[in-house]
């Protein structure tokens, strides 16, 4: 009892001065050595299939350390933690997000760019960064990333859809509609895997923008047969910068699963499904007449290997979809190394 095996140690961190005192009080005044054991973490590899809630997973140890730091010690403690995490892009993404949460915007950008460099130009890493910028409401930066991806991969209709959504969130409604229409018009010869599904998503979301801001838009060049609305209470889509997901399920307030057999209906114009595009996952559902209460989003996650690129889910919820009073809600969820049937998000109607 009390013995420590080297095989049970995940990392060793040496803390000095304020960082050690912040964790251990007077006992840490002369410094401290922190041994991180191998245990279940939000971002620790696991290959045992199970059902669980993401919110119940413990945070990484470095997040527990940084969260007790005072503002004037934040950067110093970050630099100490970096010594044992410098090769992990996910560390920089986590730290950047927390610095932004603490209103340390300049440092957050600097840290995030370090994480982007570790992704080595990988398109999925760039999408992870764009998701982070969206979360921070820095839509211009997200737009620039999506435009760069689309220039390098013109057939990547998934990134074009991301660009259209970013324009919409930034209030550039005409550019949003134009981009959606570009997806819809994409040449038949450019079909790659599930391009047709992305065209259908583009029709849905283009009409959502038009239904809300028609008076501000020039839609004269759009085929009028494509301008139509089928309003629903909720339109939900979940996508990732990774492909290791399947089987999105939505549990209603009474615990009933969203299927085509009950009062819920599949997303307008296409059946409920999940599909992959350029190594990314996306899935969606619509609910025509939503019952009041709590909804739970569950998904099968297979990301049990450690990758250099951080893995995120982005949950897009349109309330009063394709109606003049519709509201867009977006959730960004870190999903590194999750494996199992995971409840990733909840929302109320």
Question: Model-derived features: where do they sit?
Answer:
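Residue at a conserved register position within TPR or TPR-like alpha-solenoid repeats
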Residues: 98-99, 133, 167, 210
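Intrinsic-disorder/low-complexity signal
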Residues: 209-349
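TPR/TPR-like (Sel1-like) alpha-helical repeat modules
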Residues: 151, 168, 172-192, 203-210
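Short, small/polar-rich motifs associated with maturation and membrane association
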Residues: 1-48
């Amino acid at each position: 009892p009390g013995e420590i095996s080297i095989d049970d140690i995940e990392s060793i961190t040496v803390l000095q001065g304020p960082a050690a005192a912040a964790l251990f009080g007077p006992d840490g005044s002369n410094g401290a050595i922190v041994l991180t054991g191998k245990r279940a973490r939000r971002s620790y590899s696991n290959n045992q299939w199970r059902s669980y809630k993401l919110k119940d997973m413990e945070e990484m140890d470095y997040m527990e350390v940084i969260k007790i730091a005072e503002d004037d010690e934040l950067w110093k403690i970050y630099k100490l933690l970096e010594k044992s995490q410098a090769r992990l892009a996910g560390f920089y993404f986590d730290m950047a997000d927390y610095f932004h949460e603490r209103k340390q915007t300049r440092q957050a950008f600097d840290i995030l760019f370090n994480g982007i460099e570790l992704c080595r130009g990988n398109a999925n890493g760039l999408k992870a960064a764009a998701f982070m910028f969206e979360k921070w409401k820095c839509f211009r930066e997200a737009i620039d990333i999506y435009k760069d991806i689309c220039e390098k991969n013109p057939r990547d209709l998934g990134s074009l859809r991301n660009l259209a959504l970013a324009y919409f969130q930034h209030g550039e409604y005409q550019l949003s509609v134009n981009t959606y229409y570009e997806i819809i018009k994409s040449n038949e010869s450019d079909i790659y895997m599930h391009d047709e599904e992305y065209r259908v998503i583009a029709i849905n979301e283009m009409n959502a923008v038009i239904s809300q801001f028609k008076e501000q838009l020039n839609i004269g060049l759009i085929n009028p047969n494509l301008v139509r609305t089928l309003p629903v209470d909720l339109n939900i889509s979940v996508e990732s910068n990774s492909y290791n997901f399947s089987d999105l399920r939505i549990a209603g307030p009474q615990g009933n699963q969203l299927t085509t057999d009950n009062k819920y209906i599949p997303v307008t114009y296409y059946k409920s499904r999940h599909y992959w595009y350029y190594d990314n996952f996306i899935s969606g559902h619509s609910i025509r007449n939503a019952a009041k209460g709590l909804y739970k989003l569950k998904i099968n996650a297979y990301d049990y290997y450690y990758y250099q690129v951080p893995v995120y889910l982005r949950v897009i919820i349109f309330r009063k979809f394709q109606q003049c009073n519709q509201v867009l809600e977006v959730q960004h969820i870190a999903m590194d190394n999750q494996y199992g049937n995971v409840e990733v998000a909840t929302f109320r109607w």
